A protein has these predicted regions:
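Pol beta-like nucleotidyltransferase catalytic core
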Residues: 2-91, 95-169, 173-284
Length: 284
C-alpha cells in the first residue's frame, strides 16, 4: 500500500503533535510508530505534497470569522483535495462551523442525527479498583461553576452528602477546594465523582466520563438524556436522587463493570489508535 500524506491544519486550540509520543493503546507502541505502521506520513501545517487534509473546528470564542477560517473554507470548497473535519465543540458553541460542515466529512463530539461520532482520545490507566475502599468516602466534582451545576451541588450538600469541588474559577460554596492541578491524582483520592457535560444536547459526549472511569471513580453522569454509550453500559450511574442515596449499595456492581470495561477491548473507543484509525480510514 502506498504512503498516505496527511496535512493537519493547525488550530488555535487543538493540535496533535503532542500525542505522537503517547501510547496508542495498551501495547506501549507510540502514536508516531503506529502511524508509520499504517504507512502514514503526518505533516503539521498545510503542505503541497499532502494527499489529504485534516481540519479542526474552533468555538465561538476562537475566531469564527478569521483569516484562518476563510482560508480553510476556501480550500474545502474550491480545491479538490480530500479532507475531514473534526469538531470538538458543542453545536451551540460552534453554530457557524456546524452550519457549514459537510456531514459526510465531519466527525463531532455532538453529532446529533447528522454527523459521525468523534471520541476524544485518552491514555489507558489502571483504575485501581482493588484499593477503592481506602479512598475518601466523598464525592469529587471537577468543573466550572455554571448556574445549573451550582444548583445541583447545593442540592447534594443539602442531602447531607460530603462533596468537594475543584475548578480555577471559585464556586460560591464553602466546599470549593481550588484548582485541581492534576485531575487524575485528585480523582483517585475519592470514591465518587460527578461529571456534568458542557452540553446536554445533540448527543454531546466529551472525554470527561472516561477520565473519571479510568481513575476508578463511581461516576454520576449528567448528559443528553438521549445519549447511549453501549461500551460503557453499567460502568457509571445516571445522576438522580435515588442513585446518590444508594451509592454505597450500587458501587460494587459499578466497580465490577469498570474493571471489565478497562481490561477488555471496550475502552479502546477512547484510545489514540481508534482516534487515528477513524481519521485514516475516512480516506481509505
Amino acid at each position: 500500500m502506498n504512503s498516505l500524506i496527511i496535512a493537519e491544519i493547525p488550530s488555535g486550540i487543538w493540535n496533535f503533535p503532542p500525542y505522537f509520543g503517547l501510547p496508542v493503546d495498551r501495547s506501549g507502541l507510540t502514536v508516531a510508530d503506529y502511524l508509520k505502521q499504517r504507512n502514514i506520513i503526518w505533516k503539521f501545517g498545510d503542505d503541497p505534497t499532502a494527499d489529504v487534509r485534516v481540519y479542526k473546528e474552533e468555538n465561538i470564542r476562537n475566531g469564527l470569522i478569521s483569516f484562518r477560517r476563510l482560508k480553510n473554507e476556501y480550500q474545502k470548497r474550491i480545491e479538490k483535495k480530500p479532507y475531514i473535519n473534526l469538531n470538538g465543540e458543542a453545536q451551540e458553541n460552534s453554530r457557524i462551523a456546524y452550519f457549514l460542515a459537510d456531514p459526510e466529512r465531519t466527525l463531532s463530539v455532538a453529532p446529533g442525527n447528522r454527523y459521525k461520532r468523534l471520541f476524544f482520545p485518552r491514555e489507558w490507566s489502571d483504575p485501581g479498583i482493588e484499593t477503592w475502599n481506602q479512598r475518601m468516602d466523598r464525592i469529587c466534582w471537577i468543573g466550572r461553576p455554571l448556574p445549573e451545576r451550582i444548583r445541583l451541588a447545593k442540592n447534594i450538600a443539602a442531602m447531607g452528602i460530603d462533596i468537594d469541588i475543584y475548578s480555577k474559577e471559585p464556586w460560591p460554596l464553602k466546599n470549593w477546594m481550588g484548582y485541581a492541578t492534576d485531575e487524575a491524582d485528585v480523582s483517585q483520592k475519592y470514591k465518587y465523582r460527578v461529571v456534568f457535560e458542557n452540553s446536554l444536547k445533540n448527543l454531546y459526549h466529551s472525554e470527561k466520563l472516561f477520565n473519571s472511569i479510568r481513575t476508578g471513580c463511581v461516576t454520576f453522569y449528567i448528559s443528553d438524556p438521549n445519549l447511549e454509550l453501549p461500551n460503557l453500559k453499567g460502568a457509571y450511574l445516571s445522576m438522580n436522587h435515588d442513585n446518590i442515596l444508594k451509592r454505597e449499595e450500587l458501587s460494587q456492581e459499578i466497580l465490577k463493570n469498570i474493571g471489565k470495561f478497562m481490561l477488555s477491548g471496550d475502552w479502546e473507543i477512547y484510545s489514540f489508535k481508534s482516534f487515528f484509525d477513524r481519521i485514516i480510514d475516512s480516506f481509505r
